[in-house]
């Protein structure tokens, strides 16, 4: 028979994260949501208890926890507010796991290690104003010039766009090839202060305390070493990243499904 009980380590993890969220996040989230204010210290607080590196191997600065443990962490963050779960979902699920799967060893040392250590925050830029999340129809381009590329285009509805240090973005290296012409690039905000710009999307209906924004790229010059995978691998990488990220979203739904019957009972009583 399949044993679905949590291990003692997993139970301790849940208790630790639950207590942390109650102490650090719960007291201010209501006011921040009403005001549309994003606390820029969220990631630093998550890093203070090692959550950004939860499921990455220790050789990359992580803690080597299993994927179920990541789901449990996300459930506890979600219980307080989706803002906190989203930060970790994007950082680990969309970007970190993508790098762990597709990046070279040098790239992992360059990007994944500081991410897992909680030193750098990452975001994921796929959606566009005129294409949505239809990768084949994206308009952002990466024009090759020798050993470099010039990236131009816009990404929207990007979680942590304004606060992220690293940005995983997708652009067409072959605009005529549909989804087969998309490539993936990792940008370090510090290297592109003059050509990379981000802006918050304000007065949103939901996730008002989150950092959600747009990315604007104007002749952002990157090298071949900044490309993840080969040219044309962008679609596969994007879908792989989304698979990992959606796991944490599913845990969000599981958490709400377990919580709402209790709330309904409290209301009826």
Regions found by a protein language model. Name each.
Residues 140-143:
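A structural signal for short hydrophobic beta-strand segments in well-ordered beta-sheet cores
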Residues 118-126:
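A short, Trp-centered hydrophobic/proline-enriched beta-strand micro-motif
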Residues 148, 152-197:
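A short core secondary-structure module
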Residues 115, 130-133, 157-160, 174-176, ...:
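Short Gly/Pro-enriched turn/cap motifs at secondary-structure boundaries
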Residues 2-13, 197-269:
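Glycine-rich beta->alpha junctions and the first turn(s) of the following alpha-helix
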Residues 50, 74-78, 171, 187-194, ...:
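Short Ser/Thr-interspersed hydrophobic loop/turn segments at strand-loop and sheet-helix junctions
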Residues 14, 37-41, 62-70:
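A structural motif shared across PLP-dependent enzymes of the aminotransferase-like
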Residues 48-119, 159-166, 178:
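Internal helix-loop-helix
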């Amino acid at each position: 028979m399949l044993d679905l009980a949590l291990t003692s380590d997993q139970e301790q993890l849940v208790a630790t994260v639950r207590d942390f969220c109650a102490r650090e996040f719960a007291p201010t989230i209501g006011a921040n949501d009403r005001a549309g204010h994003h606390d820029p210290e969220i990631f630093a607080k998550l890093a203070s208890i090692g959550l950004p590196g939860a499921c990455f191997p220790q050789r990359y600065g992580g803690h080597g926890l299993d994927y179920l443990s990541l789901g449990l962490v996300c459930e506890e963050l979600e219980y307080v507010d989706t803002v906190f779960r989203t930060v970790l979902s994007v950082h680990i699920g969309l970007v970190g796991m993508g790098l762990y799967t597709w990046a070279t060893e040098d790239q992992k040392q360059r990007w994944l290690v500081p991410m897992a250590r909680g030193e750098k925050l990452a975001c994921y830029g796929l959606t566009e104003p005129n294409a949505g999340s239809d990768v084949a129809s994206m308009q952002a381009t990466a024009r090759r010039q020798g050993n470099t590329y010039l990236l131009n285009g816009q990404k929207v509805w990007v979680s942590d766009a304004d606060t992220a240090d690293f940005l995983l973005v997708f652009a067409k290296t072959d605009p005529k090839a549909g989804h087969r012409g998309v490539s993936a690039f990792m940008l370090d905000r510090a290297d592109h202060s003059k050509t990379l710009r981000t802006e918050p999307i304000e007065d949103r209906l939901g996730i008002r305390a989150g950092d959600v924004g747009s990315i604007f790229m104007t002749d952002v010059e990157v090298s071949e070493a900044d490309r993840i995978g080969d040219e044309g691998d962008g679609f596969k990488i994007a879908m792989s990243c989304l698979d990992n990220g959606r796991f944490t979203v599913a845990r969000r739904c599981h958490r709400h499904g377990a919580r709402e019957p209790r709330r309904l009972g409290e209301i009826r009583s």
